[in-house]
Amino acid sequence: MNLQEYWLPFTVTHVITLSLIFFCYKWPKIGKVAWGIIFILAGIFNIYTGISNPQAYVDYGSQAVDLYKRFIYGVFSSYTSLIVSLIALGQILIGIFLFMKRTLFLLGILGGIIFLLAISPLGIGSAFPSTLLMAISLVLLYIRYRKA
């Protein structure tokens, strides 16, 4: 994909991200549900796409930082479906944990933050810098939800 093809998903992602920040601040219970659903649906989508069209994930290498490029075009390209499926299972667990309370909720928050920071080096393929803003929204969610 070239930059022109990324423009619409990039813009939509940033609008959603700003909405999530707002919800996590103003209505943390809604933010919690929204994030839980997002992670679960993203995990399901990634399992399906990772199995049916693994090349789509290898294509993200063109926009990634060099360290990620080497990994994507190396080991990852040989085991794309397996690696994407394992990551997607992690996304589903994060989503489930975000529906929980206390320790599991915190694990969901931490897992989500780590995941979002880990995909940031994919560049525009991860809609960077929205991934950093999303991680901030999860921190905000944790702080605000504990007070709600």
What are these regions (language model features)?
Residues 1-64, 70-148:
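Extended, low-polarity transmembrane helix blocks
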